[in-house]
């Protein structure tokens, strides 16, 4: 009557028991990834706030001070490589504008180990020193590295979105 042998039942029991820790580990991994994504989003918000405040001190805290850090802003004419150059680029940009308004209209974050990337769309409004306003949307990619529980930026690229004229 019994369709399963005692040996088959024992093997099936072992397989099911083995899946419980694996399932638990996957659940913990997903929870960690969710936590990392939330922390990357928070780091992105700190970055945006530093830009809006034109605060180089705040910018200094969100970036990794590495020779491989990179910056390409929406008004850039060159790629800036290395933290010292990145910091100077931000100082220059902060000096060009009396006000910066920036918000994330869309954001997608992914983590993989100690590296994360956030891509999305920024809405930007700049008040120049001459009183003229420059408004645009930009595709943005930010890359972060996890260091001691903190996610620090190692690359920022923002590219203006060109819209076809009607």
Predicted regions mapped to residue ranges:
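Positively charged n-region of N-terminal signal peptides that target proteins for export
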Residues: 1-6
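Bacterial N-terminal signal peptides
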Residues: 8-21
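Short, low-complexity N-terminal intrinsically disordered segments enriched in polar/charged residues
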Residues: 20-62, 165-166
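Short beta-strand edge/turn micro-motifs at domain boundaries
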Residues: 23, 117, 137-164
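A solvent-exposed, acidic/Ser-Thr-rich amphipathic alpha-helical stretch
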Residues: 35-38, 56-111, 121, 135
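A short, structured loop/turn motif at beta-sheet edges
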Residues: 109-116, 129-132, 144-150
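A short acidic/glycine-rich loop-to-helix N-cap element
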Residues: 129-135, 163-166
